UniProtKB/Swiss-Prot annotation:
Compositional bias segments (type: Polar residues): 1-16
The UniProt record lists the keyword Disulfide bond: yes
Keyword Hydrolase: no
GO molecular function list: acetylcholine receptor inhibitor activity; ion channel regulator activity; toxin activity
Cited function: Binds to muscle nicotinic acetylcholine receptor (nAChR) and inhibit acetylcholine from binding to the receptor, thereby impairing neuromuscular transmission.
Protein name per Swiss-Prot or TrEMBL: Short neurotoxin 1
CDD domains hit by this protein: TFP_snake_toxin
Tissues expressed in: Expressed by the venom gland.
Keywords: Acetylcholine receptor inhibiting toxin, Disulfide bond, Ion channel impairing toxin, Neurotoxin, Postsynaptic neurotoxin, Secreted, Toxin
S-S bridge residues: 3-23, 17-40, 42-53, 54-59
A family per Pfam: Toxin_cobra-type
Superkingdom per UniProt: Eukaryota
Family: Belongs to the three-finger toxin family. Short-chain subfamily. Type I alpha-neurotoxin sub-subfamily.
Amino acid sequence: MECHNQQSSQPPTTKTCPGETNCYKKQWSDHRGTIIERGCGCPSVKKGVKINCCTTDRCNN
């Protein structure tokens, strides 16, 4: 699996994730504005955090 791993609006970068079957994109807001985090897997998130998990290479941009 290959997933994007750049933060928020940074230029796209990817990471190879051996053994993973998901990529994720988490989104939340704080005093800095909207924060976006991308990576491998499908982590559980706390209330107020939106997450989108997907199962194809580079699907989480």
